[in-house]
């Protein structure tokens, strides 16, 4: 009996030894794997540091290049302005010389008449000037040969916006707004306010639905949808979870401004972009969020749906434009540029996307391939591109042109050639605003361009000629956003404005 127990003990000892051997082997192997992993981690960190260094070097080079380019452009602009000033001085000197010669001739003629002619009756008192018939209309009209020029004089009726000083013939005054008309043209357009919509904070954006029945507005933490006809509030959209999630997406001030809103083509969905880097897709029938698109690393400033309704384009301060597939909620294409993106737009046929940025440039890409089709900037052949950040872009209804508004106080109209061997050109530069241009849009008939500015005004421009037809002063603060209803017709239309005075307003224009 005892010998058998001894055999069991020996067997147990052998098994324990085998287990110990296996454990030692596994421990050695684990140590080996750990060492390999540490080597891999070390190499990864080293390569990541090298990549970060390379990226920083590239950013530094881009910054240096941009500064050098800006310095050259500023010097060129200074020289151009100096030449323009010199030309104007020479022209004024020549005109003064001519006037002096004419005065001398008139004095000589009067002296001769006094010698040979009998005394004349005393001169009649001067007739006060109240009509434009004796005013030089050329000061109010853009010279056709200078349509695209970046440097032009502001028409006199836009230089002083004091309604009390305006000619009664060329103004319309209301308790809450007034309109100044260009005296060189007949008052064919009339502007009336339809609704004034109060908000609790600055109105950052306004946008009509495709059928023109509804308008969406974005302000602090809230998106609202109104009936255009009645002005009734039909939806108030607030993401309550944004107040609960105090993570990296929360702004330091606790504010969450809705920077952009856009209806889907069928009007069933509303996309909103905000400071927390998120794009929210709302179902308007339930007033609930059905998708959240994540990927941007900074504030989202602009959104636009594609005509098919399955894709959405976004622009962000993180220097990227992204195209989203709403069927998968994934980003299908990312387009990176040198500076923050402030505005995006999709062409009517969905084939092109345009973006404006802080680097004073409008870029146009093929929406399918991501190929850069056009770069519209101050470096074009004629040197008549924008000279400051571009804050708004809009395609014309036929998709052949792009309007852009900039902090350089101008609006520009670009003709898209769509050919690799021929560059797109700036057709018209619209001069008249006295401060930053923050928003632009085109009427569906391509007859007018509307622009909103920090000078609190909205200007109606004749798209083809570049002439300012009228200025609407309808807010007490900057006009941050302007939008036109797509169902506007040639003789009448609806547009909306959003302002820093915490109001969104719906307006109607009629053409006589």
Swiss-Prot record:
Keywords: Repeat, Repressor, Transcription, Transcription regulation, Virulence, WD repeat. It comes from the Eukaryota. Residues 119-128 have a biased composition (Pro residues). Induction: Expression is more than fourfold higher in white-phase cells than in opaque-phase cells. Up-regulated by farnesol in biofilm. One of its GO terms (biological process) is cell-cell adhesion. Residues 90-130 are annotated as: Disordered. Disruption phenotype: Leads to exclusive filamentous growth. GO terms for cellular component: nucleus; SCF ubiquitin ligase complex; transcription repressor complex. GO terms for molecular function: DNA-binding transcription repressor activity; histone binding; histone deacetylase binding; mediator complex binding; phosphatidylinositol-3,5-bisphosphate binding; transcription corepressor activity; ubiquitin-like ligase-substrate adaptor activity. Represses transcription by RNA polymerase II. Represses genes responsible for initiating filamentous growth such as HWP1, RBT1, RBT2, RBT4, RBT5, RBT7 and WAP1; and this repression is lifted under inducing environmental conditions. Also represses genes which participate in pathogenesis. Crucial component of the response to farnesol. Plays an important role in the regulation of white-opaque switching. This is Transcriptional repressor TUP1. It comes from Candida albicans (strain SC5314 / ATCC MYA-2876) (Yeast).
